Each structure stands twice: as structure tokens, then as C-alpha cells.
Amino acid sequence: IKSRLKPGVEFIAVMKGDGYRHGIAGLYPTLKECGIDSYAVAIWEEGKMLRDAGATESILILGDTADDMLDEAAKYDLDLTVFSMEGAENMAAAARRAGKKQNVQIKLNTGMNRIGFPVCQESFDTIKKICEMDDLNVTGIFTHFARADEGDHTSARKQLDLYLHAVNELEKM
């Protein structure tokens, strides 16, 4: 798969649910041999499991990280998902306590309706402010398509269009 990617495109292994019940620690050495560039997990404990298994690559927590776990996430050098100004401020405070910048990725809500900034001007303004925060390093932006596995891709296409619109608007700012 990686050989088919364009140069500069990262190959990310999603390891939610303890590696989809295969065991994160056991899968890590094999995935490393495959040339995985970074990892994504659902919760900070899974990120810790990867670090404990020897992972030095970037690890993104896809879900919400509770405020009382932000210091632990910083300790294990885990990238966080941000989807509110309040969350960003709490992440920045934890980064200051840790004495380092916190890597974060912006989550957009294009239809899954769990977490994420809605695609609207108010969100774009908030995201711009987050990008300007001294203690945060915004490394990316992502979404999670709802119903993407259905045979009819109409819904997924609408979500992709919404995501691309948001990225385009943010790049203008």
C-alpha cells in the first residue's frame, strides 16, 4: 500500500480497540517493519500501550481526551484531537505545565455527529485562533465519514465536499 502513495504522504495505521482486538503491543513490531509513519488510536491509554511497546513515531488520539488526562498525554508525547476552544485552552495549559508544545489535529464534523467543529464560519474563526496559540502545534485536520462503507457513496461524497470546502476556507485565512 505504501508504495502506491505519493512522496510526502504519510502512512498511518489506525489501532483503535487494542488494534481491533489483535493487541497493539503485538502488532507494533510488524507494522513498524511495514514502514508505518505514524499511528492513530481511540484513547490515550492505547497511545501509552504503543509507547510502552517501543513506538517512537507520532501517535494521534482520535477521540476526546479528558482534561484530567492531558498531562499524561503530554508525558507520553501523544498528539491530541481538538474540537473546541475550551479543549484547546486546556491542552495549551497542559503543554505549558509539561514545558513543551502540544501537537494537535483539528477534527471537523462533516456528518458523523460525535465530535468535531461544525463546518461554518464561526468554527473557522475559532480554528484560526487555535492555530495562533503559542503552546499548540497544529499538525493536521481530519474528519470521520459517516456511512462510508455503504454501497451508495452519495453521503460520503457530500461529506468529502464539505470537508474540502472547510479546508479551502481555512487555507484562505
Name every feature range the model reports, one short phrase each.
Residues 4:
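Conserved PLP-enzyme active-site core in the AAT-like
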Residues 7-173:
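Active-site-proximal beta-alpha core segment in soluble small-molecule metabolic enzymes
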